[in-house]
C-alpha cells in the first residue's frame, strides 16, 4: 500500500508509468474487494465541486481520484462494489434526449444527487480486465451519446488515455470494470437487455420438448399426468387463497367449509330426481326422492349442501333449528321413524369422517345423537326381547348385553372396574347378534360426538375431526342404513309360537295410531283437539239433531242409529288368524252389562256389508289416520260440541279402553239385538253410521269414501298394564345425557 502513502501532488501521472506498473497499481487498488470494510471507514459518497475538477494544477491522477468520489486528501480503504443507483436531479428535470439508454453492466453509471452531476466512483463494477472484448465494443458504441456537459474526458481503455467522441471534449464517459462476483448481476433492466433476445427461443425450445414428451406418452400416462396437474392446481389454489386473503377471515370459525368444494373433494353432483337438500326439511310432501343409497350419499355433494347451509345460518336461527330437531327426534311416533332418523344422523357423521371435513360442534345432528341409543332401547323394550334374543320367557344373557350397551357406566371403586365401558368400546363388527351390532353402532357414534363436542368447547381455536375420536373404527365400518337393516331384519326373521310376541312385533312396525276413549276437562278445556279432529269431517248441519238430543237432558243416550249398529266388524285387510277366532267368540257371547243398560234398538236402517273369504286375505294397507280420531259436530243454535264415541266393553278387571274405528272416530259399543248377552272376548270396530236428522234423512259423510283401510286392531288383553315395560329393574333405566360419560 506504499502507493497510497504518497502525496497527491507528488504522484506521477498515469501516462508516465509503464504498463507493468499500471497493472500492479490497479491490482493493489482492487485487492480489497472481498474483504469486509469496518463501519467506521464507510463514508457517504458526495460529488466533488467543479472547481476541484477544473483546476489547472490538477494532474490526471487527481482527475481519476475525483471520478471515484474522493472528497479529501486522506487515505480511505477501498469499498467493495455495489449495484449502481439511478436517480435524476431533484431540482431540474433533464431532457430525456440527453440521457443514454441502459448500458451493459460493465459500463453502468448513475446520475448524481445535486446539479445533475454524475457519480463515477465505486458505484460501478470492477475487474474489467476479465471482461470480453464484446463489452468493449458495446461501450464504444454507446460512448457517442452525450451524458453531461460537466465532463470532458473518460478513461475507456487500459492505458488510461482520454478519448474524445464526436469532436466534443465535454461528452466523456469512464468505463468501470466489473468484478467477477458481480458480473451479470445488475439492475433488473439490464437483465432484460442481456436475455431479452434469448428468452423467446428458449421458451420455444422448452415447449417443443414438452410437445415431444406428450406425443411419446400413452393413454395411461396422459391420465396420470392430468391427475397430477389437477392436484398441483388445487394445491396452488389453496396456497394462493391462504396468502391472498380469499380464505376464511379471522372472524370465521375454524370449522368453516369455504376451502372445501365439490371439485376438491371429487364429489359428483347429486341426481336431479332427489329432493332439494335443505336445512329445514319440514315439508310433509317432499317433491323428489328421499331414499338414497350408500353411494349416492357418500360420493355426491348432497350432504355437502346441507352442511354448508348449517354454516351459513346465523346463530339464533341455528339454535332454533336445533330445538326443532330435538323435538322431532324425541317425539318419533314409531320404530320405523326412529330408525330412519338414526340412520340419517349416522350417515351424516360418516360423510364427515370419509371426506375429512371439520365438524361443526353446534350442528343439529351432533346435538341429537347423544340420546338416540336410549330412545332406541325404549322402542325395542316394548317388544318381547326375551323371546327375540334369548328364545325364552324371561331375560337372558343377550338381553343383559343389550341393556349394558345402553346404560351409563357406573362409578366404581378404585380397585373395581366396570366392564360396561369396555363393552361399549368394542368394535361393532365383533357382535354376532344383529341388535347388539346395531346398538353398538349407535353407542359408538354417540360417544365420538360427545367427545368431539367436549374437546371443541375446551380448545376453541383448532378444528376437530371425527377420526381423532373414532377409537374402535365404528365410522369406518358403518354403511348407510345399517342400523335399520339389522334391527328390522332381525324382527322380520324372528319366528315363534307366541302370539303375544307376534302382536308386539306387529304393533312396533305399524304406524302410530291414536287410542283415547274420552277427553275430560275441568272448568275449561286447554286441550288442542285439532290434533285429533280431521280436516275433512262432516259439517255442523249434518249433526245438528244429534247435538239437540244431547242438550235435552243431563245424560247422553245413544241414538237409534247407534243402537241399531252395535255389531262391530274388523276390517278384512287387518284381520289376523287369532282375530278371526276372537271375532267368532264375540258374536256368540255379547256383553250382558251393556245389553241391560242399553235401550231396545231398532233394526238397522242401512244394510251392513258382508265380506267374502277372499277379501279377508287381502294385504294390510297401512294408514296413519291419527288426525281424524274424533269427529266434531257443532249445533248451530247452542254451539254444542258432540263427539261420536265408542265405549269399549270391559272385561274384569280391566277398565274401559278405547279402540279406534274404521274411519278414525270412537263409536259407542252396545250389543246388537240379534245376539245374546254374553260379553265379547275382543272388542271390534264398527263402521260409521250417519246420524239421522229430524226429517229422517241420513246424512252422508264425505270421508267414508276417502279414508283408506284401518290398521290392525288392538286386542282387549293388551291394555296399558300388559303393554308395560317387561324389563327387570326398569326404574334404573332412566334417560341420561351422554355428556356425562367419561
Swiss-Prot record:
Main location: virion
Protein name according to UniProt: mRNA export factor ICP27 homolog
GO molecular function, one term: zinc ion binding
Species this protein is from: Human cytomegalovirus (strain Merlin)
Protein origin, superkingdom: Viruses
Physiological role: Immediate early (EI) protein that plays many roles during productive infection including regulation of host cell cycle progression, regulation of viral gene expression or nuclear export of intronless viral RNAs. Acts as a transcriptional transactivator via interaction with the cellular transcription elongation factor SUPT6H and as a nuclear RNA export factor via interaction with UAP56, a component of the cellular mRNA export machinery.
Biased composition (Acidic residues): 614-626
GO BP, sorted A to Z: regulation of DNA-templated transcription; symbiont-mediated perturbation of host cell cycle G1/S transition checkpoint
Alphabetic keyword roster: G1/S host cell cycle checkpoint dysregulation by virus, Host cytoplasm, Host nucleus, Host-virus interaction, Metal-binding, Modulation of host cell cycle by virus, Phosphoprotein, Transcription, Transcription regulation, Virion, Virion tegument, Zinc, Zinc-finger
InterPro entries linked to this entry: ICP27-like
Ranges annotated as biased composition (Basic and acidic residues): 1-11, 153-171, 578-587
